[in-house]
């Protein structure tokens, strides 16, 4: 996560920071025969007006869910961003879905898309909160609004465990 474009473009300089090196020792010293990853994919996103800053609402043991909503054209993608800004984020908050960030992908794979991250203490809480979201009367109203029909053509969800050196 970066506060601005300059911070984003200077991100590699942080790798030589002593604290980062200490916390990421296992990762940075992984062997070619047992790499920490296959390849890295990066995206440049614009934060949503409804959640302009990254937050970490839960510390300690937790799981992250990274969700990507792909759209079949740019207009539908913008309408889905609007849907979040005009009510869906508020429904998340009301039903216990704790968000880390929401971003519209400007540069990256599979555009047009938006990506957001949620955090939970465990899978059981995740299930309860999503059920509350699906039953919320404002969600039922919003999802049936004509303007928001067919805004998402594909959803990709990934579950992540935070590493000791993770910024989130």
What residue spans do the PLM features occupy?
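Short S/T/G/P-rich N-terminal loop/turn motif that feeds into the first structured element of a domain
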Residues: 1-139, 148-168
